[in-house]
Every structure is written in C-alpha cells, then in structure tokens.
C-alpha cells in the first residue's frame, strides 16, 4: 500500500511518477523499496490520468448515497404495512388450525 501512497504523494506535489522518485519517497518513509514492485507500479500507472481516476472513485459514493435513501424510506413504509397484514393473516390461520386441532383431540 505504501507504494500507491508514494505515487499519490508524488502526484499531489506535481512530481513525475518514476522509479527514481518512488524509491526516494519510500526510502524517506523508512521503507526498503522492492525493484519489482516499483517497476510494476510505474508500468501500471503509465498513461493513467490519476486526477480522473480519483474523481471517478469518489463520485459514485456521493451520488449513490443520496438517491438510495429516498426510495428505501418510501418503499419501507408500504412493505411494513404489507408485512403486518401478512403476519395478521398468518396468525389467524394458525389460530384456526389450533382450534381444529383441539377439536380433533376431543373427538379423536
């Protein structure tokens, strides 16, 4: 994770994300850099617009949270009423079954 943080730090200060700069940031943080991981990260970030990726990653969270709450509340009240009706009907059915079971025991 520290490799990604180092890349984001370099990006935020406007420095080029390359092997040399990543090594310097990691060493300054007390991390012993691994060449393979640094090369893989630099290759993976090549051609990637980091600002755009950050914006896309943050955007759905804010957008998805607001609309999801409104429909859930409206539908939740209707569902609760339907569930209460269904429970009452089930209780009535159970009561009738218990009554019939009691009668069958009398005439068994």
Swiss-Prot record:
Q: Which residues are connected by disulfide bridges in this protein?
A: none
The UniProt subunit note reads as follows: Part of the 50S ribosomal subunit. Homodimer, it forms part of the ribosomal stalk which helps the ribosome interact with GTP-bound translation factors. Forms a heptameric uL10/P0(P1)2(P1)2(P1)2 complex, where uL10/P0 forms an elongated spine to which the P1 dimers bind in a sequential fashion.
Per the record, the domain of life is Archaea
Keyword list, A-Z = Ribonucleoprotein, Ribosomal protein
Q: What does the record give as the organism's lineage?
A: Archaea, Methanobacteriati, Methanobacteriota, Thermococci, Thermococcales
- Residue ranges annotated as compositionally biased, kind Acidic residues, are 84-99
Record protein name field:
Large ribosomal subunit protein P1
CDD domains named among the record's database cross-references: Ribosomal_L12p (cd05832)
Gene3D superfamilies in UniProt: 1.10.10.1410
Molecular-function annotations in GO: structural constituent of ribosome
Homology family: Belongs to the eukaryotic ribosomal protein P1/P2 family.
């Amino acid at each position: 994770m520290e490799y990604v943080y180092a890349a984001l730090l370099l990006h935020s200060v406007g420095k080029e994300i390359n092997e040399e700069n990543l090594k310097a940031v990691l060493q300054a943080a007390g991390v012993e850099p691994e060449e393979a991981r640094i090369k893989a990260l630099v290759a993976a970030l090549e051609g990637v617009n980091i600002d755009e990726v950050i914006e896309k990653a943050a955007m759905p969270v804010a957008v998805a949270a607001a609309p999801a709450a409104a429909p859930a509340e409206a539908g939740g009240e209707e569902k609760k009423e339907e569930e209460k009706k269904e429970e009452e009907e089930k209780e009535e059915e159970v009561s009738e079954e218990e009554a019939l079971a009691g009668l069958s025991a009398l005439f068994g």
